[in-house]
Structure formats: structure tokens, C-alpha cells
Regions:
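A generic structural signal for alpha->beta connector loops
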Residues: 166, 202-203
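Conserved helicase NTPase motor core
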Residues: 74-192
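Charged, glycine/proline-rich intrinsically disordered loops and linkers
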Residues: 51-84
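Key residue(s) within conserved catalytic/signature motifs
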Residues: 32, 47, 51, 135, ...
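Surface-exposed polar/charged interaction patches
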Residues: 14, 40, 44, 57, ...
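Conserved P-loop NTPase-based nucleic-acid remodeling module centered on helicase motor cores
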Residues: 1-46, 50, 188-191, 195, ...
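Short, conserved catalytic or interaction motifs in soluble domains
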Residues: 43, 50, 62, 143, ...
Length: 204
């Protein structure tokens, strides 16, 4: 919403480093890109540090790509440019998140990530829910994000039967009706359901 955009714009303004690779973006585009990357990270429970490390490794590989007539190919140059932009955006995402902490702001994605951490760190949370509900039905499963799928697995599945493996969980969904990819939904969760929620024997 507008409030998120204002916080992101303020984070961009407060960022101390020059933005060499993002200078082509307009004052409106830059906060929008920050929010988009922040949302993508949250939906996959990835940290800026993890994506930065991956991006640097990818950059090193592209720099070693074969040359064409003594120069990098157009595709390689475009890939390097995209990586450099992402590295600067990651800096801005970190500034945005620090600003939110200073302002005491919490978004839905933050609550979602905290819920995953809670479920992973305290098995009693999942155990309590499994005692409360006899079965679980996950409707429109194609519209769940990776983070939401991880949360559900932490609550209603596990390494053994005492931690939830084999708990009666049913998912209903159609990958052809997936319409929320723009907000992190991953229709691939349907394909992974049999292994994410195996039978008590461990079989899909």
C-alpha cells in the first residue's frame, strides 16, 4: 500500500551509499523494486545475506564465461548488470527492514516468517494444533507461498510420527488456476505435497 511505499522511499533516501547500477530508475520505480525484492525474499524465507552470497557466486561464474571475439557476449553483460542491480537492491532492502524495526512496523510477511521460526523452534506449537484438530484441509493450495508451505509442514508434518508425520492432511488445488504468483504463491507446492506430507511410514 501507500504506507509501505512511503517507508521504502524513506529507506532509499536514507541509504548512505551511492547507487551506481540503479541510477536509471525513477524515484518511483526504485522503492517499488525494493518492495518487490523484499516480498520475494519473505515469501521464500530467504535472507539478504543468502541471496547476496548466491549472487556473488553467480557473478564470479559469469565473469569466467567464454568470450566472443575478445569480449563478453551481450547475454553475459546483461546477466552481470542484473546481478549488480540486485546487489544494490539488497542493500536497500536491508535499510528498509532496519527502518521498519526503528519505526516499530510489522508487515504480514514479517509475521509469517516469525510464525515459521516459532513452529520450528517450539515443537509444542504444532503438537497443540494436532491435538486440537483431527484433520487438516488445505484449500486452494496452488495459491500458497513457499513460506506458507514451510509453516504448514512445520506444524502438521515432521521427521517421525511423534512430530506429525502421517497426520491426516489433505490439499485441494489446481495449478492451472494459480493467480497469485505476483505475491509469492508457488503452484509447485502441489507437486511437492506427497513428499512434504508423507504417510506415517514415510512413503509419499
Amino acid at each position: 500500500g501507500a504506507s509501505r511505499f512511503r517507508v521504502a522511499a524513506r529507506a532509499v533516501a536514507e541509504h548512505p551509499l551511492p547507487l551506481e547500477h540503479l541510477s536509471r530508475l525513477s524515484p518511483r520505480q526504485l522503492p517499488e523494486r525494493v518492495l518487490a525484492l523484499d516480498a520475494a525474499l519473505e515469501s521464500h524465507l530467504a535472507t539478504p545475506a543468502q541471496v547476496r552470497e548466491f549472487s556473488l557466486r553467480a557473478r564470479a561464474r559469469f565473469e569466467k564465461a567464454p568470450l566472443w571475439r575478445g569480449s563478453p557476449t551481450k547475454a553475459v553483460l546483461e546477466a552481470l548488470g542484473a546481478i549488480d542491480e540486485r546487489l544494490e537492491l539488497l542493500e536497500l532492502v536491508e535499510t528498509y527492514r532496519e527502518l521498519k524495526r526503528r519505526l516499530g512496523l510489522v508487515e504480514f510477511a514479517d509475521q509469517q516468517a516469525q510464525a515459521v521460526e516459532l513452529a520450528r523452534s517450539f515443537p509444542v506449537v504444532g503438537a497443540t494444533l494436532r491435538q486440537r484438530f483431527r484433520v487438516v484441509l488445505l484449500d486452494e493450495y496452488q495459491d500458497t507461498s513457499s513460506a506458507q508451505a514451510i509453516l504448514l509442514r512445520a506444524l502438521f508434518s515432521g521427521a517421525d510420527t511423534t512430530s506429525g508425520r502421517g497426520f491426516p492432511v489433505t490439499a485441494v488445488g489446481d495449478p492451472n488456476q494459480a493467480i497469485y504468483g505476483w505475491r509469492g504463491a508457488a503452484a509447485s507446492n502441489i507437486l511437492g505435497f506427497p513428499t512434504h506430507f508423507p504417510r506415517a511410514t514415510g512413503e509419499p
